[in-house]
Amino acid sequence: MMADEEEEAKQVLQKLQELVDQLYCFRDSYFETHSVEDAGQKQQDVQEEMEKTLRQMEEVLGSVQVEAQALMLKGKALNVTPDYSPEAEVLLSKAVKLEPELVEAWNQLGEVYWKKGDVAAAHTCFSGALTHCKNKVSLQNLSMVLRQLQTDSGDEHSRHVMDSVRQAKLAVQMDVLDGRSWYILGNAYLSLYFNTGQNPKISQQALSAYAQAEKVDRKASSNPDLHLNRATLHKYEESYGEALEGFSQAATLDPAWPEPQQREQQLLEFLSRLTNLLASKGKTKPKKLQSMLGNLRPAHLGPCGDGRYQSATGQKVTLQLKPLSTLQPGVNSGTVVLGKVVFSLTTEEKVPFTFGLVDSDGPCYAVMVYNVVQSWGVLIGDSVAIPEPNLRHHQIQHKGKDYSFSSVRVETPLLLVVNGKPQNSSSQASATVASRPQCE
């Protein structure tokens, strides 16, 4: 190539790069130039901006021969929307064949495969890009892909989740001011939380990473997935006000995405049904309730009543039977409560299994049991003992509605004694987390 041709090609590439950068800036900074009310228009606006950019790129290219880099930039422009683009796949595949060291082409091609649903091919692209050059985009995307790879065993999936956290941490280390890296680290911790027995320390790390994403990058606050994923964690931790706020914000930012609105509505319906059932003690007639409570026996405490109960520290302790009304917020060590089931409530998500518990002292308390298999449950009239109950008082306000109730959180059905009997180990399952894979 002659010197002046080289210079022309260089200028053309520079102009193409500027056009693509402007396109991505339009998409990523959309809510800095538009109000949240325009959220429903965003995808259409981005699509139109992409078409305009592609026309401008064709004009700039003319008859100039600038192979791999130009193919990559055109493929990247086509890849700006959340949808899979076959044309982008063709252009980017050509680009990496012509110039295998072109890391950005590998990253873009990986994203195309990701949108196509070919997770294994996406993994190959991001891993391959890292062999050419360590870069934060490949690390971010590899973290994301590792959590979605098909595995033959739970152990293998756990290894992938741990590796996902490692890759996200490396991405953060490369640029602590990149909000996307912090957001993906939050998602990696979210998966780790559900994959390793819901350690509160890990949920705190997830929430901290999401907060850091918003702190270092204003655009992160406009990411509906961040709000939905964080709300999922808040809901599981029974921070219902924050969960509702997050679902609502995600729905506002992406009105075309039905899930946030559905999740907000489901949670509101759950809280409404629950508070109504608690207030009416499961609509149990006073005479029936009196008869049920009259059947409570010390024998119903099972291993919680004879000094054989083993606490979380592994020591055998004698538990003191106390009325539900005397419980303090938090874990009530050395205490056991015993009551009758007056209703049960399941949601579409099946987690938690919720039932109402009453003792002779009066008020009805919600008991929320986590990590249960679908076939497990308790029946109205069952006697249930809960050792060292973890109490929480809820005061929730959302969109003009108020919900107020008390609940006992039970991390596994294995802690419960039902009709004097400990629960079988087959009653326990582990929670999983679902997310929208194409939108990290």
From Swiss-Prot:
Motif (Nuclear export signal) positions are 13-24
Swiss-Prot/TrEMBL TPR repeat ranges: 7-61, 68-98, 103-130, 136-174, 179-216, 224-253
Example GO BP: positive regulation of mRNA catabolic process
Show the disulfide pairing.
none
Q: Which Pfam families match?
A: TTC5_OB (PF16669)
Phosphoserine modifications at = S203, S221
Record's subcellular location: Nucleus; Cytoplasm; Cytoplasmic vesicle; Mitochondrion matrix
Q: Where is this region: Mediates interaction with 28S rRNA of ribosome-coding tubulin?
A: 285-287
Q: Which domain of life is it from?
A: Eukaryota
Q: A GO CC term?
A: cytoplasm
Q: Name one GO molecular function term.
A: ribosome binding
Q: How is it modified after translation?
A: Phosphorylation by ATM kinase induces nuclear accumulation while interfering with nuclear export, and phosphorylation by CHEK2 kinase enhances nuclear stability.
The record's annotation in Gene3D superfamilies points to: 2.40.50.550, Tetratricopeptide repeat domain
Keywords attached to this Swiss-Prot or TrEMBL record, sorted alphabetically, are: Cytoplasm, Cytoplasmic vesicle, DNA damage, DNA repair, Mitochondrion, Nucleus, Phosphoprotein, Repeat, TPR repeat
Q: What residues does the record give for site: Mediates interaction with N-terminal MREI motif of beta-tubulin nascent chain? A: R147, D225, E259
Subunit description: Interacts with JMY and p300/EP300; the interaction occurs in the nucleus and augments the association between JMY and p300/EP300 in response to DNA damage. Interacts with PRMT5; the interaction is DNA damage-dependent and promotes PRMT5 interaction with p53/TP53 and subsequent methylation. Forms a complex with HSF1 and p300/EP300; these interactions augment chromatin-bound HSF1 and p300/EP300 histone acetyltransferase activity, resulting in enhanced heat-shock-responsive transcription.
Q: Let me see what the UniProt entry remarks about domains.
A: The tetratricopep-repeat (TPR) motifs may function as protein interaction domains.
Q: What does this protein do?
A: Cofactor involved in the regulation of various cellular mechanisms such as actin regulation, autophagy, chromatin regulation and DNA repair. In physiological conditions, interacts with cofactor JMY in the cytoplasm which prevents JMY's actin nucleation activity and ability to activate the Arp2/3 complex. Acts as a negative regulator of nutrient stress-induced autophagy by inhibiting JMY's interaction with MAP1LC3B, thereby preventing autophagosome formation. Involves in tubulin autoregulation by promoting its degradation in response to excess soluble tubulin.
This protein's name: Tetratricopeptide repeat protein 5
